[in-house]
Amino acid sequence: MGKVLGVVGWSGSGKTTLLEHLVAGLAARGMRVNVIKHSHHDVVLEPPHKDSARLRSAGAAEVMLASPYRIAVVRELRAEPEPGLAELLSQLSPAALTLVEGYKWAAIPKLEVHRPSIGQPAVYPDDELIVAVASNVPRPEGARAGLAWLDLDDPASVLAWLDEWMKLSVTP
């Protein structure tokens, strides 16, 4: 398995926007990147009248939709517990990097996206696994030593940090 980095922060902080920049920058260089995105909502991936939704409604445990352009697998959990992050990671095809949006308290290295204007506290003071913070405010006094502080408004600098982190970090 390649490297895994969580991208965490409160709703509205800009996690997905930053991830778009990071994935695009890495993919443009030919790097294979996977993404796992967690949602607390009941996600509807296709309209109920479409074939794959109808088959899931009929009782199929999993439905795989395949075309010359992409493959999608939808598994209905029904009464099963939500799989943990390790299980989800094991189901992905190999990649140099898997970025994980959400799973705030998972035991993986993380980049926090922190935007104080949304009115939520930073997570990094309570999570030693946060290795960097991308924010639109300067590094506060008292931020722990070794914590990278990145400019959220400069995605290229966050990408440069990610390149260095990938060279230095140990693959799990």
Give the location of each predicted region.
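Hydrophobic anchor at the beta1->P-loop junction of P-loop NTPases
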Residues: 7
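The conserved Walker
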Residues: 11
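Conserved lysine of the Walker
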Residues: 15
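N-terminal phosphate/diphosphate-binding loop that engages ATP/GTP or pyrophosphate donors
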Residues: 21-83
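Phosphate-binding/switch loop-helix module in NTP-utilizing enzymes
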Residues: 76-105
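Short, hydrophobic beta-strand segments that form beta-sheet elements in well-ordered domains
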Residues: 98-100, 110-115, 129-137
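Conserved C-terminal guanine-recognition region of P-loop GTPase G domains, centered on the G4
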Residues: 105, 109-126
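Conserved NTP phosphate-binding and transfer environment spanning the P-loop NTPase/kinase superfamily
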Residues: 129-172
